[in-house]
């Protein structure tokens, strides 16, 4: 029985890896060893980046909410506390979007949070405005 040669599989494997490494600078796109190291490291960076993306967006949403809340005389922490007291269950992503795209609706929510902080009864039915809603 003839000896099995790995040359076809090995070449295919190397070609596949070098294809993944296209666009890398220096030896990292031509040398198999360096390309292999860089492709692996790129995977690590991508994994970490996916986790960081979540943190970065949360921080951005908080900054936007804070800026909008301060326009209505509340700090971010007091605004969020007021929302909890008022019984609002809106996440930061929705609040940030509201603050950017519909400031008057955010103002209505901020007024409800302010009322809850001051101990006034909270209106359960609030019209947030907007056409066709």
UniProtKB/Swiss-Prot annotation:
GO BP annotation list: ribosomal large subunit assembly; translation
Pfam family, one: Ribosomal_L20
Superkingdom of the source species: Bacteria
Cellular compartments per GO CC: ribonucleoprotein complex; ribosome
Family annotation (CDD domains): Ribosomal_L20
GO molecular-function terms, A-Z: rRNA binding; structural constituent of ribosome
Keywords tagged on the record: Ribonucleoprotein, Ribosomal protein, RNA-binding, rRNA-binding
SUPFAM superfamilies: Ribosomal protein L20
Family that this chain belongs to: Belongs to the bacterial ribosomal protein bL20 family.
Function: Binds directly to 23S ribosomal RNA and is necessary for the in vitro assembly process of the 50S ribosomal subunit. It is not involved in the protein synthesizing functions of that subunit.
Protein's UniProt name: Large ribosomal subunit protein bL20
Source taxonomy: Bacteria, Bacillati, Actinomycetota, Rubrobacteria, Rubrobacterales
